[in-house]
């Protein structure tokens, strides 16, 4: 099949993603992409916003059980808030949770006290992000013993769906807002390329609850869109595919592409002529071959100590020039005899 690659190769694309961090950079940031073809700012901005708000997974409280309380319309002696108010406060707890759920958490307090989210007893794989959130107030002599259930999910789940069929008496289901995203907005402006002003500039502002950074959030959203759109591409566009990289004997028509891709993957990263900062970051992260590098995602790279957005853009540009990118899946990597393969392939290409 003849594929007109000009359909996408000749479109204007941003060469890098600029990030404007707020005072609380772990929770809020603005991402600026330019230049984009006319109309693409709205297309990408709206798609990313919808995915960010609806599809990212997070942790939330799904139910609570309070000692000596039968239902949410009860009250506790010595507790200033009604159980209904306590439930409303519990819904605002922001959790960062590793592994699978559900998991049980305990909260015990004796008055007089101001009970906060930070008083919840958690295990090593759960972290309360908003520890100063006030849950209730206890008077002198009052006690509070509460069991909270946390789980992982996406979107919004009403309390009625969080009640199991075999729920014990006293279990109070809670509305769960799993999304780690608190707010997303975008703005599209005109961008200049040379003397032309017929391009878009997209500014995407993301605010999270602190359980995920804005950089990771936008990367997850873009990856979701990428994964969903792959279904619609029914042809190969001539870019070397990673699946053929580790094939020992490729079919004759594909031999050149396989050798070319193998040559890149088996090349060491210290041959890429990167800046000293980028090269040191890769070395410290034990990334030796390009095959090691391309399997890393952008989010993983940004978590590398001293590795910033400037280094990321530098590496992406170098990989792009070779028809490669971050986040590739290479079955069988690394091969057991990687050093021997690298030397042999280099000799074949030179010979």
UniProtKB/Swiss-Prot annotation:
Keywords: DNA-directed RNA polymerase, Nucleotidyltransferase, Transcription, Transferase. Pfam families: RNA_pol_A_bac, RNA_pol_A_CTD, RNA_pol_L. Homodimer. The RNAP catalytic core consists of 2 alpha, 1 beta, 1 beta' and 1 omega subunit. When a sigma factor is associated with the core the holoenzyme is formed, which can initiate transcription. SMART domains: RPOLD. Its EC number is 2.7.7.6. Disulfide bonds: none annotated. This is DNA-directed RNA polymerase subunit alpha. The gene is rpoA. The keyword Transferase applies. One of its GO terms (cellular component) is DNA-directed RNA polymerase complex. The keyword Nucleotidyltransferase applies. Signal peptide: none annotated. It comes from Erythrobacter litoralis (strain HTCC2594). The lineage of its organism: Bacteria, Pseudomonadati, Pseudomonadota, Alphaproteobacteria, Sphingomonadales.
């Amino acid at each position: 099949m003849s594929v007109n690659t000009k359909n996408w190769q000749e479109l204007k694309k941003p060469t890098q993603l600029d990030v404007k961090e707020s005072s609380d950079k772990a929770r809020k940031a603005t991402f600026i992409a330019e230049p984009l073809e006319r109309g693409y700012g709205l297309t990408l901005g709206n798609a990313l916003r919808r995915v960010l708000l609806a599809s990212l997974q997070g942790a939330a409280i799904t139910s609570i059980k309070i000692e000596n309380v039968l239902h949410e319309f009860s009250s506790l002696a010595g507790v200033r808030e009604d159980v209904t108010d306590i439930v409303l406060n519990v819904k605002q707890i922001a959790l960062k949770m590793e592994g699978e759920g559900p998991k049980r958490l305990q909260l015990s307090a004796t008055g007089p006290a101001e009970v906060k989210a930070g008083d919840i007893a958690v295990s090593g794989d759960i972290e309360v992000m908003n520890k100063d959130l006030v849950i209730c107030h206890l008077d002198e002599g009052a006690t509070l013993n509460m069991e909270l259930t946390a789980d992982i999910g996406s979107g919004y789940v009403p309390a009625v769906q969080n009640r199991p069929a075999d729920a014990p008496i006293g279990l109070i289901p809670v509305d769960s807002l799993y999304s780690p995203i608190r707010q997303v907005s975008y703005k599209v402006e005109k961008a200049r390329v040379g003397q032309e002003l017929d391009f878009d500039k997209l500014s995407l502002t993301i605010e999270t609850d602190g359980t995920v950074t804005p950089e990771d959030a936008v990367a997850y959203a873009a990856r979701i869109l990428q994964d969903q759109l792959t279904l619609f591409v029914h042809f190969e566009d001539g870019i070397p595919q990673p699946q053929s990289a580790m094939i020992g004997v490729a079919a004759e028509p594909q031999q050149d592409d396989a050798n070319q891709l193998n040559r890149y993957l088996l090349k060491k990263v210290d041959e890429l002529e990167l800046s000293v900062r980028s090269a040191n970051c890769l070395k410290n992260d034990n990334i030796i071959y390009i095959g090691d590098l391309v399997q890393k995602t952008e989010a993983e790279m940004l978590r590398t100590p001293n590795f910033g957005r400037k280094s990321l853009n530098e590496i992406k540009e170098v990989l792009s020039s070779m028809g490669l990118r971050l986040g590739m899946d290479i079955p069988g990597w690394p091969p057991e005899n990687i050093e021997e393969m690298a030397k042999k392939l280099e000799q074949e290409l030179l010979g």
